[in-house]
């Protein structure tokens, strides 16, 4: 049974659609097939889980959009949230 979802093939995180405990199997659909991985940490409902390793400095992609930059290496199955993602909005003052 699927307990997470991705929207776009570019996504490197899935969204938990129910609470997921450390060690649980996380299953989501990608390209018409179910994909599974093991949760490395507890994931709160509607929070993100890495579906592949995300090196420090790489964009975090959800729903096909960059939502931040990994502030540390994030391993497959880990919780992805403010503790390991930083914003990447442009600083408009620097451009003026």
Residue ranges, per PLM feature:
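Charge-rich, low-complexity amphipathic helices
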Residues: 35-38, 42, 48, 82, ...
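C-terminal structural segments of small proteins and small subunits
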Residues: 63, 67-94
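Compact, glycine-rich, soluble single-domain proteins
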Residues: 27-63, 69
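A short, sequence-level motif marking secondary-structure junctions
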Residues: 21, 40-44, 72-76
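Extended boundary segments
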Residues: 1-39
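Hydrophobic aliphatic residue packing
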Residues: 13-15, 26, 60, 74, ...
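Loop/turn positions that initiate beta-strands
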Residues: 23, 46, 57, 77-80
């Amino acid at each position: 049974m699927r307990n997470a979802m991705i929207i776009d093939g570019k996504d490197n995180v899935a969204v938990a659609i129910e609470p997921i405990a450390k060690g649980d199997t996380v299953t989501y659909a990608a390209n018409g097939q179910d994909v599974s991985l093991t949760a490395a940490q507890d994931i709160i409902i509607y929070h993100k889980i890495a579906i592949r390793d995300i090196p420090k400095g790489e964009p975090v992609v959800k729903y096909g959009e960059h939502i931040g930059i990994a502030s540390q290496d994030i391993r497959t199955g880990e919780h992805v949230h403010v503790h390991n993602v930083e914003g990447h909005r442009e600083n408009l003052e620097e451009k003026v």
